[in-house]
Amino acid sequence: HLTFNGGVLRTTASFTLNSNRGISLLSNGTILTDPGTTLTYGGIIAGSGNLLKDGTGTLVLSGNNTNTGSIGINSGTLRISSENNLGSVPGSFDSDKLMFNDGTLNITSSVTLNSNSGISYTGTNANFDINNGTTLTINGIVSGGGAMTKLGTGNLTLSGVNTYTATTTINAGTISISADSGLGAAPGSPSA
């Protein structure tokens, strides 16, 4: 069992953490993956603390997690295949259920995020890398001052009344919206 009461777990090689080794977030904890490495974990993450993904490597979460705090991406890639990989759905709107400082969220199967699960940008850019043939649907509000970049050939559907203020860039795949607000707050004057 691994318990975070603060501090950092740093991984220096690619490997799979035994799924029987539960992770408890008594307080905030950081998982730092070194460059070019991948940590895969399919066990349960529980507790009320926040979990931060740091380091330029990749963290793969595949468990039905019950943690109630925020998930933060500071750098590198967080890879998921289900909303449950991010923990319990908030009972009411949480603007920071998923927080980007920078880094990438990679989606390997179609995922729908509940409208109570808000996403906030605190850094310069948030990358959404959606694999081919899959869709990430964000029903909550995306807020903050950072930009959004769409990567991967899959589809990103933005259904919320989003308030983020920087640019939206499509490098690959599709972004689907049903209203202007899907692309965040409109500029105060024309821009190009």
Predicted regions and their residues:
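Beta-strand repeat architectures
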Residues: 1-39, 46-60, 68-136, 143-157, ...
